Structure formats: C-alpha cells, structure tokens
C-alpha cells in the first residue's frame, strides 16, 4: 500500500466516523420528541379504543397514524443498529490508526537516524498537542520514524559532527599544502633564473624559514639557495658563512628524513664548498663527508647526472692530492681517500651519456682528464665543445676562464 493510499484511507475513516458521530448526536437530541409523540398517539388510541369499547364499537386507527407508528418503529430499530456500528468503529479506530502508523514506520526504516535521536522529544509537536486531536499523516510519519524538519536541520549525530570536523581539518591541511607548494615552486623557478632572481628567492626562503623549517622539501631548497649565494659572492667570509649555513640546513633536513637524495646531495656540496677555505685537516674531513653523502644520494637517486658530475669532481680532486695531504689523511683517518684520473673520467663520461651538453664545466673536466692521460687531441675536442656553449651564469664564466687556460697549455 503506498503512502498516498494510506493517507486517503485514514482521512476517509476519520470523515466517516465524524459523520456517524454527528448523526448519533442528532438522534439523541430528537429521540425524546419521537418517543413523546409516539406515547401521545398511543394514549390517544387507547382513549379512542376505550370510548369505542364503552360505546361497543371496534377501535379503528387512522391509516396515517398507523403508517407513522410503523416508520417510527423502523427508525428506532435503525438507531439501535447504528449504536452498535458506532461502538464497533470506536473500538476499531485506535487499532486502525496504530496499524497505519506501523506501516508508515516500517516504510521509513531506511530513513531512521542515529539512536541518539530516538530519545529526543519533538518540542514543536508538544506545543500543538492540545490544539489537534488527531495528527496528520505527515506528523504520523515524523513521530513514527522521529524524522522531522527540526531533527534534519538542527540535530546532528556524533558521526556527522566528526565528519564536519574532519572536512574542516582536511581543508586546512590542503590550504597549508598549497601554500607550501607555491613557495617550493618559487624556489625552483628562482634557482633557474638570473642572479637577481636567485637573490629574491633566497630572501623569500629566509622569510618562510620559521613557518616551514620542519619541512624537508623546504630545507634542502634553502640549502640550495645558500649554495646560489655562495656562487654569486666574491667575498671570502661571505662564502664561508653561506657554505657553513647551507651545510647546517642540509644536515637538519637529513635528520628529519634520511632518505632524501636532495638533502644528502646538498650537504655534500656544502662540504665541498667549505673545503676550499679550511685547513688541510678540515679539508680532508669534509672530503670524507662529501663522499659519504654523495654515495648515499646516488643510491637514493641513481638517475641524476649532477651527482655523477660531483663524484667525478671528487675523484679528480683526490687524484690531485699532494704527498703531504695524503700523509695527513692517513694520520687522521687511517686510510686516506683514493681515486684515479680514470675513475674521474668515467663519471664525467657518464654525465655526458645521461645528458649530452650537460654543462660547460663537465666539458672542461673531460678535457682535463684526457690531457692528464696524454690524449691532447681528445682534450682539445672537448675544449671546442665547451667554447660552443654560451656562458649563462657565473659558473659558466668561471668554466670559460679555466678552459682558456687549459687550451693554452694544450697548444704548447
């Protein structure tokens, strides 16, 4: 049975009951008159009969009076039957109402809300309880399933409140992540830009250091920005400060996440920068740190040509260590670092294989390796390759200077 059919049946029953009640009330009010008229007629008939008896005549009732008596008798019988029907309806209506509610309640099982709502009384229905004797079908539905506009809009379960809180937290996290990504994007763009761009990026990174100082992605980029500042300045003290601060920042990133190849890479680079301005002892110590963290970076990210270029630089530098530097290394660390020109060359060639024309400096060191190996013609070839590349930044300009000096020695 559909909801509309239930509603129509219930309203029809109520209308019928109201009509029957009204008929009964009218009958009760008019019954004395009918009974009184019947008594008077019967009394009159008895008197007439008595007179006729006294006179010795047969009592003949008027045809109209007899017809009225017959109708009144039928009416009284109908009233008695109607009383029985009304009594039956009074007994049946509560059961029918309950049956309809049960059907509606069963129909709305799927829409019932959390158990908390079952114990909550509908305040709005209480305020109007005395005004309406029977609830409407809509009220019956809301009372049966405790689903009303009031509960839908004003009452929440723990799950709903928890979901709203979670959504708010997710929105906050998403917003913070978007801000961080914007900062990282600016850092990457500035690193690839001009010197003024790199300076602006460095200041921007310092401004966000307190906010994102616990984010590995931010920290290794900040260390990289210190490296850019190291390259751009010519003041020795500034270079040392930039390198020292960059090393400290990269070290913090490694502490937070040891599996970040970029953090290990920039820690190694800062160690290499510092070794240019330190004593022999500290230079060798930073050399060991350089190799340790560079190997870790290559292990974590073996497809980055920069790391093989740096490894080639380390191998070349170790191959050029003086006798006294080797002795100091042996005294301090037991086994001094060892590397050959051939190992350096293999790393530079790997860079060229992975990324042809990677950098002007990579061509310069290829030329140096072949020169040291006695292959001057091949060395000159790579010098020509380096000359064909434009000097896009300070590093390229420094590479050009070294290449010019190298070409002079090769042509002697």
Curated annotation (Swiss-Prot):
InterPro entries per record: RMD1-3_a_helical_rpt, TPR-like_helical_dom_sf
Stretches that traverse the bilayer: 9-27
Keywords: Coiled coil, Membrane, Transmembrane, Transmembrane helix
Cellular localization per UniProt: Membrane
Protein origin, superkingdom: Eukaryota
Pfam family membership, one: RMD1-3
Region (Disordered): 106-159
Membrane topology: Single-pass membrane protein
GO cellular component entries: membrane
Residue ranges with Basic residues bias: 114-124
Sections of the chain in a coiled coil: 157-184
Gene3D superfamilies with a match to the protein in the record: Tetratricopeptide repeat domain
Similarity-based family: Belongs to the RMDN family.
PANTHER family: REGULATOR OF MICROTUBULE DYNAMICS PROTEIN, REGULATOR OF MICROTUBULE DYNAMICS PROTEIN 2
Name recorded for this polypeptide: Regulator of microtubule dynamics protein 2
